[in-house]
UniProtKB/Swiss-Prot annotation:
Reactions that this protein is recorded to catalyse: [protein]-peptidylproline (omega=180) = [protein]-peptidylproline (omega=0)
Similarity remark: Belongs to the cyclophilin-type PPIase family. PPIase A subfamily.
Keyword Isomerase applies: yes
Superkingdom field: Eukaryota
Protein's name in the database: Peptidyl-prolyl cis-trans isomerase
EC number assigned by the record: 5.2.1.8
């Protein structure tokens, strides 16, 4: 694992800590998209965007920096890009995976699993995992609900590459 990226998170306007992601080498196109959206080097990205959907015991979803509600976002390659491969599985909590609207519809939205979610294998591209900051993810999970609506705003206040 080569590339590492981070999110600094606030919950309800208060700093909640840092999540560090270790990204997998065998999904280079997916990793490069996430990395560039963390640094903002293309003029757009994750900084200042929120986690719009958090379901306890399942996952925390973010990455819609255009609409903020799960309908938007875009990749560095244009609007959408293909599923690179399904080498990695949703085999444990704290996996980082691409959200999508079906086959080959990756943009910028992603999710962090908080449980084993093996029914997503072969449908969503897993491209990294949480290396540190599991406690921050758990704090985020605590403000989620079964509908996915958060009781407090969960924001990426800063992000980048380490």
């Amino acid at each position: 694992m080569g590339v590492k990226c981070f999110f600094d998170i606030s919950i309800g306007g208060k700093p909640a800590g840092r999540i560090v992601f270790a990204l997998f080498d065998d999904v280079p196109k997916t990793v490069e998209n996430f990395r560039a959206l963390c640094t903002g080097e293309k003029g757009f990205g994750y900084k200042g965007s929120k986690f719009h959907r958090i379901i306890p015991g399942f996952m925390c979803q973010g990455g819609d920096f255009t609409a903020g509600n799960g309908t938007g976002g875009k990749s560095i390659y244009g609007s959408k890009f293909e599923d690179e491969n399904f080498n990695h599985k949703h085999s444990k909590p704290m996996m980082l995976s691409m959200a999508n609207a079906g086959k080959n519809t990756n943009g910028s939205q992603f999710f962090i699993t908080t449980a084993v979610t093996s029914w997503l294998d072969g449908k969503h591209v897993v491209f990294g995992e949480v290396e540190s900051g599991e406690d921050v993810v758990k704090d985020m999970e605590a403000v989620g609900s079964s509908s996915g609506k958060t009781s407090q705003e969960v924001l990426i206040t800063d992000c980048g590459q380490l």
